[in-house]
A protein has these predicted regions:
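N-terminal alpha-helical transmembrane segments of multi-pass membrane transport
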Residues: 1, 6, 10-35, 44-47
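Glycine-rich phosphate/diphosphate-binding loop of Rossmann-like nucleotide-binding domains
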Residues: 1-8, 12-15, 137-227
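Generic detector of short, locally flexible boundary/turn motifs and exposed helical patches
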Residues: 19-21, 75-80, 153-157
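Generic structural hydrophobic/aromatic packing signal, biased to beta-strands
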Residues: 22, 54, 82, 111-114, ...
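Short, ordered loop/turn segments at secondary-structure junctions
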Residues: 27, 58-59, 193-195
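Alpha-helix initiation/capping motif
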Residues: 28, 35-37, 166, 222
Length: 227
């Protein structure tokens, strides 16, 4: 369906008015399976090269899709793969035009949601715990020394998940958010569960604050917006 819609958009709205030169990458599930998902990586690298892309909706397979499409494996989300390569930020901005009325009538200004697009659940490692036993986080330094943290001492079957992120990616995320707020003249609100996640989420909070204080505080004051 997305192929049909994109073709209609190009044929009716774009090609009659502009000389559109594009590279096309088929991210349909069957073709991703045929190429061992290499086509998704190729599409991401092309996006990085040209600085712009239009991506249509894709299927991220679950167990039922594995059987339906006879897949080699349960391929990861194309969005997650592309975002990780681009180290990008997802901005969900509302459509604000006459004729489209907001659900909350007294909201006159747009609310944009910014989400970090690297790591977290998109690059996680999961396992099903078959029975009693310990799940641990282990960090092995280059010199071979190890640091261990107990995740949970299971008394029966369950599930476990490990996630990661990078300081430089969080810094890039912070700058994207601050620059977007300045460009659109929107106040920026930061939300995380740092009171519970005192290392993972708190690192996001600390990095945002450090960058804001060092590089953006005066710019925000001049623009009349707040963080």
């Amino acid at each position: 369906m997305t192929r049909i819609l994109w073709k209609m958009i190009k044929d009716d709205l774009l090609l009659p008015y502009i000389d559109l030169k594009t590279e096309y990458y088929d991210l349909g599930l069957e073709h991703r399976n045929e190429t061992d998902d290499q086509v998704t990586i190729d599409a991401a690298m092309a996006t990085k090269k040209y600085g712009v892309a239009v991506k249509c909706a894709t299927i991220t397979p679950n167990a039922a899709r594995m059987t339906e499409y006879d897949l080699k494996e349960m391929w990861k989300s194309p969005n997650g793969t592309i975002r990780a390569i681009l180290d990008g930020t997802v901005f969900r901005a509302p459509i604000v035009v006459k004729g489209i009325e907001p659900c909350v009538k007294n909201w006159k200004k747009p609310i944009t949601i910014a989400r970090h697009a690297y790591g977290d659940v998109y690059k996680n490692t999961e396992m099903k715990v078959p029975g009693p036993g310990k799940v641990e986080l282990v960090y092995t330094a280059e010199d071979g020394t190890q640091t261990k943290e107990l995740v949970f001492d299971f008394k029966g079957p369950g599930v476990a998940q490990g996630m990661h992120n990078l300081d430089n990616s969080i810094e890039s995320f912070a700058r994207s958010c601050f620059n977007y707020a300045l460009d659109t003249k929107q106040d920026l609100w930061f939300a995380t569960k740092d009171t519970i996640s005192k290392k993972y989420d708190h690192t996001f909070k600390d990095i945002f604050q450090e960058i804001f204080d060092a590089d953006y505080k005066e710019k925000f004051e001049e623009a009349g917006i707040t963080y």
